[in-house]
Design a protein with these regions (language model features):
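A post-motif C-terminal structural segment
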Residues: 1-206
Length: 207
C-alpha cells in the first residue's frame, strides 16, 4: 500500500499515546517514509508519505515491480484524486492520470486486465471561450472570490460537488471486450473475476 497522510496518522496515534514506528515494529510491518526505503527484492511494502503530491508514476512502477514477481498474478487498485475545488490542481492531476494510464498500458503484459473507471463524475465544465485569452484567465481571482468553491470564469465553471451522469469505463487485456455500452458498476467486478479465471456468485434476488 502506498499513500499519503503520515502527519495525520502520526498525530492521531499520538493522541492515543501510541507511536507509529513502535506500532509498525510490533506488527512486524515497517511503515516506510518514501519510495527509496523499499528494499530491493521486496514483494510487498507499506509506504505512508507526508503529502498527497507525490509522483504517481513512480508509485505504480515500484508497485508493479513488486507484484509482478508473484507467479499467481496480482490485483492492484490505483486511486487518484481529481475531485478538488482547486481547478488548476484538478486539471493537472487529470493530465497526470492520463499519462500514467498510457504508460501503464504499455508496461503490463497482454495477460493482464487493465480497467479504468471513476466512482462518480464531478461538476467541472468548459462552457466556451474566445480566441486569444488563455483558457484559465482570471481563475485565481475567481477562486479567491468564490463562495463555497463555486468558480465562474469566461470559459469554465465549477461547482464543488458530484454530478449524476454516467462515467467512462474502459479496459484492455483479458475480458476487455466485455466492457462497453451501459453497464452496472457491479458488472465490472464480474469482469475482474473472470480475468482471474474465477466465477462470481450470482447476484442475490431483488426483493
Amino acid at each position: 500500500m502506498i499513500g499519503a497522510g503520515r502527519p495525520a496518522v502520526t498525530a492521531a496515534l499520538k493522541e492515543a499515546s501510541l507511536d507509529l514506528d513502535a506500532v509498525s515494529q510490533k506488527g512486524g510491518r515497517p511503515v516506510l517514509k518514501n519510495f527509496s526505503e523499499i528494499p530491493d527484492g521486496a514483494t510487498r511494502a507499506l509506504v505512508m508519505l507526508d503529502s498527497g503530491e507525490f509522483d504517481l508514476q513512480t508509485a505504480i512502477d515500484r508497485t508493479l515491480r513488486m507484484l509482478s514477481a508473484n507467479p499467481r498474478g496480482y490485483f492492484l487498485m490505483v486511486e487518484w484524486d481529481t475531485h478538488t475545488d482547486r481547478v488548476r490542481l484538478g486539471l493537472d492531476r487529470l493530465v497526470t492520470l492520463d499519462r500514467v494510464i498510457a504508460r501503464t498500458a504499455q508496461k503490463v503484459g497482454s495477460d493482464t486486465l487493465l480497467l479504468f473507471t471513476a466512482d462518480h463524475s464531478f461538476d467541472l465544465r468548459l462552457r466556451g471561450g474566445t480566441f486569444g485569452p488563455q483558457l484559465l484567465d482570471g481563475l485565481e481571482q475567481a477562486e479567491a472570490d468564490a463562495p463555497k468553491g463555486q468558480v465562474r470564469i469566461t470559459s469554465l465553471r465549477m461547482d464543488n460537488g458530484h454530478t449524476g451522469e454516467e462515467v467512462l469505463a474502459a479496459a484492455q487485456g483479458p475480458g476487455a471486450e466485455r466492457v462497453g455500452g451501459f453497464m452496472a458498476n457491479t458488472d465490472l467486478f464480474r469482469v475482474m473475476m473472470a480475468a482471474y479465471g474465477w466465477e462470481a456468485s450470482p447476484p442475490s434476488p431483488t426483493r
